[in-house]
Amino acid sequence: MDEEYDVIVLGTGLTECILSGIMSVNGKKVLHMDRNPYYGGESSSITPLEELYKRFQLLEGPPESMGRGRDWNVDLIPKFLMANGQLVKMLLYTEVTRYLDFKVVEGSFVYKGGKIYKVPSTETEALASNLMGMFEKRRFRKFLVFVANFDENDPKTFEGVDPQTTSMRDVYRKFDLGQDVIDFTGHALALYRTDDYLDQPCLETINRIKLYSESLARYGKSPYLYPLYGLGELPQGFARLSAIYGGTYMLNKPVDDIIMENGKVVGVKSEGEVARCKQLICDPSYIPDRVRKAGQVIRIICILSHPIKNTNDANSCQIIIPQNQVNRKSDIYVCMISYAHNVAAQGKYIAIASTTVETTDPEKEVEPALELLEPIDQKFVAISDLYEPIDDGCESQVFCSCSYDATTHFETTCNDIKDIYKRMAGMAFDFENMKRKQNDVFGEAEQ
């Protein structure tokens, strides 16, 4: 362990690896450690399949029908990338795309009255959708046109709406949209987990719907991308970036103590040695006394031998179950991927259902999602506590990431990364400033 570093990073989750990569590119001297022998922390992909069975204490191990264990890479935290979202921009600006291959997720679906429907997000799809009646379609189309033309710097596009003060509830009212359409707009397009957004100023919701439409416009089938070989590839891509710029990596390295002087971090002790630093980044598991519990998420990993019904036999898709449809406060999500993404044996599918826990019986809460997946070959149930830091770290210079939430995209994770960056660097994270080269995520790869 070299003595002096600008930044020490503990844990190789996605948030930590992206920050470590960005800090290295910015010329900081970085030491990155993880107590685990593998990359990814909470956001790793588990391989071989035997390892997943062990992790969930299923001692009998996988049956032969599951195929070769090495063909599996199972994500512990299910998320997709928005094609036009912040994580893709981070991948592009750092050129980490050169280490990864992506596929477009084949479909985005929403649950209504016990059935699933394709999410309409263009005028043409909206007019053809069975989700709404004829008059509702016309009103929804008007709303989509309004959102597409909306420009916060051009008051001529406002149509009497003030982006800073008009609530989203009032915007829906203005277009006379019914409850079902409001549900799917807020939850399947703007991707909110709850209905708290309705009474907030409408600008953020309008921008979220724009992000969905722009992401969809890039590749057509859905706005989501997924990396071949699983999400565990993402932290590793950023770890490579950090190493190229001189970052030092140590896996399987226990952390004995974080050393503080006068309330500020000065180093990390591991196996009797001390590495000194000016700033520390870590996930909540490294500093339990500096985080508080902010809720729980249940995630159920399901292995299937068939595509999900009514998805047109898609080999990947997302299903959103809006909370109002199942009398809840938070949405339920299903992410499905398969052998087509090199994460499962031939003919096998992985569907992960997740939601924010609201009761003392979390498994019952995700039942509406599990019903859509039947028959299920094997289930792995994980209930995780969500943690957030108790302070902003500016005084101690210890910057802690938040746990990964129940959403099925990385926008909230990217907000956390930008927020930590701002607190560490004293200035906002600027894509333009740092972007060295803009190219397509797919490079020359087929879509």
From Swiss-Prot:
It holds the Pfam family GDI. It is found in: Cytoplasm; Golgi apparatus, trans-Golgi network. GO terms for cellular component: Golgi apparatus. SUPFAM superfamilies: FAD/NAD(P)-binding domain. Keywords: Cytoplasm, Golgi apparatus, GTPase activation. GO terms for biological process: negative regulation of axonogenesis; negative regulation of protein targeting to membrane; protein transport; Rab protein signal transduction; vesicle-mediated transport. GO terms for molecular function: GTPase activator activity; Rab GDP-dissociation inhibitor activity. Belongs to the Rab GDI family. Regulates the GDP/GTP exchange reaction of most Rab proteins by inhibiting the dissociation of GDP from them, and the subsequent binding of GTP to them. Promotes the dissociation of GDP-bound Rab proteins from the membrane and inhibits their activation. Promotes the dissociation of RAB1A, RAB3A, RAB5A and RAB10 from membranes. Interacts with RHOH. Interacts with the non-phosphorylated forms of RAB1A, RAB3A, RAB5A, RAB5B, RAB5C, RAB8A, RAB8B, RAB10, RAB12, RAB35, and RAB43. This is Rab GDP dissociation inhibitor alpha. It comes from Macaca fascicularis (Crab-eating macaque).
